[in-house]
Amino acid sequence: MDYDPRAHGARCDECPLKGKTVVPSEGQIDESGEGVALVGEAPGEMEEKLRRPFVGASGKELDHDLRVAGIRRRDTLVTNVLLCRPENNDLRVLIQDINRQNREAIEHAKANDLPVPPPVASPIDCCYPRLMNELRPYSNVITLGKTATRALTGSETSIMAIRGGLMVVDATSDQPQRSVMPTVHPAFVLRQMRWAHVFRNDLAKAGRWFRGETQWNPPKVTYHPDAATLAAFLSHHPWIASDLETDGIEPLTAKIRCVGVGTADEVMICGFLSKDGTTRFYSPGEERRVREVLCDFFTDPNCTKVGHNFGLYDRLVLESQWGVTPKPVVDTLILHKSAESELPHGLAYVASLYTEAPAWKSDRDGNKVSTFAENDEALHSYCALDVAIDARVLPPLVDAVNLRDQLDVWKLDQGMQAVCADMHAVGMFVDQARRLEEEKKLLKRRFVYL
């Protein structure tokens, strides 16, 4: 008997793809709630021909990477947000065309004083009830690409910003709480093979998470420690991860909201300026003492400061606001650039490779938490995670740099970062001629930071 999506809730009669070949979901329904579902965007040409999901080139890539990750395809439900193939495999163009038709229909109705006709339905909306009905028994889902991730989590965030970050979707009246691992689509991996190890890492992490084998433990956080407690903490470590949260993005004018310092397991957050722009977190005397402790720490030659973009943005803020230049510094952004120059270097991306941290950088509307945190508590918690994650990614990043024999490249890049920061500090755009001149000087000698 042919599979009928309407029996599972699909509104096929309203769908712009009505009459197209249906590619059914594949796999056994797992009523235990412990099974794994894989959700892509839509069938491709080969899938349409064979009426099976993920059997073309992207399907072969997926099968291989699932095996590497220890997940057996036959034990999963494999499906797509849409069960029918959009023309030229381009859902984006189809959605744009539907939106254009609806706008033109509204404009025509208004211009001719006619009733506004019912809008052309989105194929995603038409197939969504079917998808949710089929996924109801599954509490573990891997979403392949932005369309599937948005359908399962409601997130408007770029897939590149949240892939590899573990997400928990709350239960509703008719759906269970779900563990969701967003990652890129295997078709993207085929076009950009440098992402293959990232994709495999995401799948392997998902498997560990679903089996309860992940190793993520949030750090112990002390908020607004007094100066004595802070000084004692900072005196016990040869290197400390650091992060600043500010009220703006221009480092020469931004004011410091909070400073986070810590290790992989313990973080201290010193609040200075509330999001309301007025409230302080210490008495004037204690704030001065805490600030003095932090300034001594940032200039202590015997303690290395570790942070993401710390050698540029955070350095410029500290110079502008507190008159101190942090030294010595190891910038994890520069470290990762030296290890994998061809891939993104944001902390969320680096954390997704080297830790099992949950997604924390953006909310589900795609807003950066550092900018749009609802309150001071949320901002301080965000800062604490940044610090702990920076501390956790440092050892594997150093190993990656050494493995690729890129230590000299890192030293050069970090030296050039310092040159560019000096230019920015005096209000200059980066002078490329001078930058090149300084780069030639750096190539003639070796900088040692560790």
Question: Where on the chain are the PLM-derived regions?
Answer:
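Short beta-strand-alpha-helix junction that forms the catalytic/metal-binding core
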Residues: G35, M181-H185, M268, T304, ...
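Active-site flanking residues adjacent to catalytic metal/cofactor-binding acidic residues
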Residues: V39, T79, V184, S242, ...
